[in-house]
Curated annotation (Swiss-Prot):
Chief location: nucleus
Keyword vocabulary terms for this entry: Nucleus, Repeat, Transcription, Transcription regulation, Ubl conjugation
Gene Ontology annotations for the cellular component aspect, listed alphabetically: nucleus
Region Disordered, annotated ranges: 504-524
Gene that encodes the chain: SMXL8
UniProt name for this protein: Protein SMAX1-LIKE 8
Polar residues bias (residue ranges): 515-524
MF term (GO), any: ATP hydrolysis activity
Tissues showing expression: Detected inaxillary branches and leaves. Expressed in the primary rosette buds and expanding leaves of adult rosettes, the vasculature of the hypocotyls, cotyledons, and mature roots, and in the midvein and petioles of young leaves.
Domain comment as written in the entry: Contains 1 EAR motif required for the interaction with TPR2.
Main function: Probable component of a transcriptional corepressor complex involved in branching control. Regulates cotyledon expansion and lateral root growth, but not germination or hypocotyl elongation. Promotes auxin transport and PIN1 accumulation in the stem and represses BRC1/TCP18 expression in axillary buds.
Length: 910
């Protein structure tokens, strides 16, 4: 039977009574006969200082905006209230009585409040004094009333439909986060979320209690103690804050800080190596067996030859190995390689990892039954609620633009092994491009830093002057002034403040770093993202010139663009326009750029807009483009992988939708798809190329010509001639290009003529359209379309954010001469050196294409030796070559295309 409102109020405090009165008003306005728990929830959410709404804001799903999820909650609540049947009309003085479910919630809260430890003594004294009236009328506080109402199944269903969990809300109300530790942009940590996170590296900002001690000395001692054991020497951290403890431990280990973690003496100098990010890429993105073998081979060499007690490998989260969406064979292979590494190098290799739940560990054991024994694992439970938020970390990426030092941390998947653990674990990424300074919370508004002293300021100025001399352009006055500014705002993607190292830290880094020592990988890690822009330039420039020869000027411009600080805090995207010939060099340099900045070649997306216009796919994976427009394909890839290099080839062929999206992206920092959805590009590098104009100099070789013959197999026919005066050696610079052997040149000319006649006949035999005005209209529309495209392209190229990178024509003639000399040397080595060799230009052309399209144009001698040595060995076996012989290699095209360059030539039988 319903309870009168006045009777129910006797059980509540003043604050709770006010909330109940508001719930009664909601029921009266809707014409309902009783006041239910849903009316109470509606009233509680509407209070000026709503504890329930504040709890919802902290446990909301970070995948949706707060406004969207609260609108969903209001909608679900309104629908549930509308389903309640209206009762008879009540008078103006009548109030809808409290329903049985709501009164039961009040009784439950009374009983729970009576059992609280802080209230137990008071109610015990009441019971001893036999004051039953006082005992029965326990005043229920508002917080306890909310907790009891959340237990109502109807209320739980409403919150569940809006994406909330009653258990999370209750825990959030019981343990409110203090103001100084509250991060409104992140989802708090709850035990019920631990097993439901599909991400490979679930990282959350801690839901903390102010009275807890965050000192990790005990956890550090426990981890170090496991390393010293003879059995079970590789710890696996399991717990809510396992990632935070692991990151702090490895940071201290990397900085050689033994205070607070009691590192044993025999472990001093232990080298920490991070392979977790690469394991995740190989299993979840794309598996490369050759790359994996090379990496583990390097790890083995580092374990054997490295100084100190050995190597500590951080393999990341066990969830990567057990995730059903990953590559299962790749996971099996990597697990076996880690086991093999431990067997080979014994006591010089340690392992460490972390996971948030024991269920993941059990799943790992079911999939790999021997891994606990092979890896010598020791479970280490982490019970302290250490914040998962690491301190300000940095890496080489921080010294690059598009980031320009504004990253305090980077996602773990962007880190290569051997680079340290400074930025391994961060919170979820959220864009700040559409936020202003005035709307930011107080802890994001400004952060002060210590003024630079005179000595440190001079050191910073000297570093900048060195960069100016290398790049050939000057810093603006505002950039120079910002060096000595008293305040600086450095907000990273996780909406947290990162401190800026002063000049003293820069000088310390300069004095301590020794870049002359050989490195195991081609990347470095700095102590601060703003350190050594000049050194960053050298690293980028060296990598680019090593991988792409003959384009030093282009490498210089790109290195300058990536080394300079960004003009805006919220815009770290870079736009490059590669102009000139050498299409292969442009693509290869962009790929190397992805490897340098994002530490992975899988973060490179290439789109050939010219091929897409002709209906030939235009991307590396044509199946993904099926049924989609090009702009939607690019948008999807950027949503899935915002840290990437987008390579747009033949940009002048872009359609109208892509033109609009690119124009908006370069202006606003948001890339839009065909449906109007947007994605931030603050961490993306756009590289655009256009079809190169024909150069004034005429050469025997061109990119188009080599592209047509790429991979086509050639049949080699050997002719031996004894007449010495009639032959020329391949050593002569003009002997190959000015001869036509066996009438092959005339045959090719005849074939081209026949094709021209066929095309002419097909054109003239078609049915003519006599509707001349329609034809003129089509021509006019096409002309206007091309004109608009040219205007758009001109405006894009003139944009201030777009950096023009000049490329020089590739020296095909010089490379051809090197190939001829290398072929002759190889022939002398395999056959004999006292006879002459004459090679068909067709064969030289195939070799030139093989070298030009290879991964490295510098290893010409080794590449040609692998291709031509089998050919010359067959010649030596099948023919009797004497001193007076002249060996002629005559080529004939076959309609066979091969990916393997080693089988490029087929030697015809005698």
């Amino acid at each position: 039977m319903p309870t009168a409102v006045n009777v129910a109020k006797q059980c509540l405090t003043a604050e709770a009574s006010y909330a109940l009165e508001e719930a009664v008003n909601v029921a009266r306005r809707r014409g309902h006969s009783q006041t239910t728990s849903l009316h109470a929830i509606s009233a509680l959410l509407s209070l000026p200082t709503s504890v329930l709404r504040d709890a919802c804001a902290r446990v909301r799903n970070s995948a949706y905006s707060p406004r969207l999820q609260f609108k969903a909650l209001d909608l679900c609540l309104s629908v549930s209230l509308d389903r309640i049947q209206s009762g008879h009309q009540l008078g103006s003085d009548d109030s809808p009585p409290v329903s049985n479910s709501l009164m039961a919630a009040i009784k439950r809260s009374q009983a729970h409040q009576r059992r609280l430890p802080e209230n137990f003594r008071i109610y015990q004294e009441m019971s001893q004094s036999q004051n039953q009236n006082s005992l029965s009328c326990v005043k229920v506080e508002l917080r306890q009333l909310i907790l009891s109402i959340l237990d109502d199944p109807v209320v739980s269903r409403v919150f569940g439909e809006a994406g909330f969990r009653s258990s999370e809300l209750k825990l959030s109300i019981i343990r409110p986060v203090p103001h100084l530790l509250r991060y409104s942009s992140q989802q708090p940590l709850f035990l019920c979320n631990l097993t439901g996170n599909p991400e490979p590296n679930p990282v959350r900002w801690g839901f903390t209690v102010p009275s807890l001690n965050f000192n990790g000395d005990l956890d550090y001692r426990r981890i170090s103690a496991v390393f010293t054991k003879d059995k079970g020497r590789n710890p696996l951290l399991v717990g809510v804050s396992a990632y935070g403890v692991l990151t702090s431990y490895l940071n201290s280990l990397e900085k050689n800080q033994t205070d607070g973690m009691i590192l044993p003496t025999k472990l001093h100098g232990l080298t920490a190596v991070n392979i977790g990010s690469e394991i995740s890429d190989q299993i979840s993105v794309k598996f490369d067996k050759t790359y994996t073998d090379t990496r583990f081979h390097d790890l083995g060499k580092l374990a054997e030859q490295g100084s100190g007690p050995g190597l500590l490998l951080h393999y990341g989260d066990l969830r990567v190995f057990t995730n059903g969406e990953g590559n299962v064979p790749a996971a099996n292979y990597i697990v076996n390689r880690i086991s093999e590494l431990l067997r080979r190098h014994g006591r010089r290799v340690w392992l460490i990892g972390a996971t948030t739940s024991n269920e993941v560990y059990e799943k790992m054991m079911r999939r790999f039954p021997n891994v606990e024994k092979d890896w010598d694992l020791q479970l280490l439970t982490i019970t302290s609620l250490k914040p998962c938020l690491p301190h300000n970390k940095s890496s080489l990426i921080g010294s690059f633009v598009p980031f320009g030092g504004f990253f305090s941390t980077t996602p773990s998947e962007l880190k290569l092994p051997f680079s340290g653990f400074k930025t391994e674990i961060t919170g979820p990424v959220s864009s700040i491009s559409d936020q202003t300074q005035s709307t930011l919370p107080p802890w994001l508004q400004m952060t002060t830093r210590t003024d630079l002293n005179q000595k440190s300021s001079a050191k910073v100025v000297q570093t900048k002057e060195g960069l100016e001399s290398v790049c050939g352009n000057k810093f603006t006055s505002s950039a120079s002034a910002s060096t000595c500014s008293a305040k600086s705002v450095t907000t990273d993607l996780n909406l947290r403040v990162s401190s800026v190292t002063t000049g003293s830290g820069l000088k310390k880094h300069l004095d301590s770093k020794d870049f002359s020592q050989p490195q195991s990988v081609s990347s470095y890690s700095f102590d601060n993202p703003r350190d050594l822009n000049a050194e960053s330039f050298k690293i980028i420039y060296r990598r680019l010139t090593d991988m792409v020869s003959g384009q030093d000027e282009a490498a210089r411009v790109i290195s300058c663009a990536l080394s300079q600080p960004p003009k805006s805090v919220t815009r770290r995207d870079v736009w490059l326009n590669l102009v000139g010939p050498d299409t292969v060099g442009k693509r290869r340099m962009s790929l190397v750029l992805a490897e340098i900045v994002y530490q992975s070649e899988h973060r490179f997306m290439a789109v050939d807009l010219g091929a897409a216009e002709q209906g030939m796919g235009g991307c590396d994976d044509p199946m993904r483009l099926r049924g989609k427009t090009m702009v939607d394909h690019i948008f999807e890839v950027m949503c899935r992988n915002p840290f990437c290099v987008v390579f747009l080839e033949n940009i002048e062929k872009a359609d109208e939708k892509l033109q609009m999206s690119l124009s908006k992206a370069i202006e606003t920092g948001k890339f839009m798809d065909s449906h109007g959805r947007e994605v931030g590009i603050g961490n993306t590098i756009f590289v655009m190329t256009s079809s190169s104009q024909g150069s004034a100099t005429t050469t025997s070789y061109s990119e188009e010509k080599l592209l047509r013959v790429k991979g086509r197999q050639v049949e080699i026919r050997i002719e031996t001639v004894s007449s010495l005066p009639m032959v020329r050696s391949v050593y002569g610079p003009t002997s190959v290009n000015k001869r036509k052997l066996m009438g092959l040149g005339n045959l090719q000319e005849t074939k081209d003529t026949v094709e021209s006649v066929k095309r002419l006949n097909r054109t003239t035999n078609g049915v003519l359209d006599l509707n001349l005005p329609a034809q003129e209209t089509e021509i006019e529309e096409k002309y206007h379309c091309e004109e608009n495209s040219n205007v758009w392209l001109m405006n894009l190229k003139n944009h201030k954010r777009l950096i023009e990178v000049p490329f020089k024509p590739f020296d095909f003639e010089g490379l051809a001469e090197k190939i001829k000399k290398s072929v002759k040397e190889n022939f002398d080595k395999c056959v004999r050196s006292d006879c002459l060799l004459e090679v068909d230009p067709k064969i030289i052309e195939r070799l030139l294409a093989a070298v030009y399209f290879s991964d490295s144009r510098k290893d010409i001698k080794e590449l040609l030796e692998n291709i031509m040595s089998p050919v010359f060995l067959r010649i030596k076996e099948r023919y009797e070559i004497t001193t007076s012989c002249v060996v002629k290699l005559v080529g004939r095209d076959l309609d066979i295309f091969l990916e393997d360059q080693m089988d490029l030539f087929f030697v015809k039988s005698q």
